[in-house]
């Protein structure tokens, strides 16, 4: 079952010597099931920190992060890790693929890390998805183009069937044409899963692909007019 994710009165503070600095202050944020949102902010605005709060990697200094009726800060770290593994899929700017492993092996890696046996069906599904996205399953990751690396990571997320996909600067280093295709593929993939999507970027080009836009500046999240 997919639930609404909410941030209520959330603040994240850090101490620098005797001074206390507020990194983020978010009065309210809601992500409905299947909703897709773009968050734009300049470099250093706190976009990655925001995603870490949404996913429970970071806990707020004050306020609550809720998934349905579950308050993430009330969970132990192992339970938060399990919640994240079950519900959240990440696309990072640096791809996080392992050299020496094939595209297929990289896609199936989360199942290996979780000590789960990879079934023939999962292997076949991953192979088919890679081919569908134009990636040779047998190519080692260090030999893939940046676009192929990105699509490999997307397939890895699809195989996890998350209810929330968080994308951190997925169009970085891509030209306008490839950036558009990458965002379209991501939106299509999220839609095929019925997953919610939060994409953060400094790239103005991505905004036209989303109905809901937010801006992160000076540590605050506001609707984009």
Each model region followed by its residue ranges:
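Conserved catalytic motifs of ABC-family nucleotide-binding domains
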Residues: 161
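Catalytic Walker B motif of ABC-type/P-loop ATPase nucleotide-binding domains
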Residues: 165-168
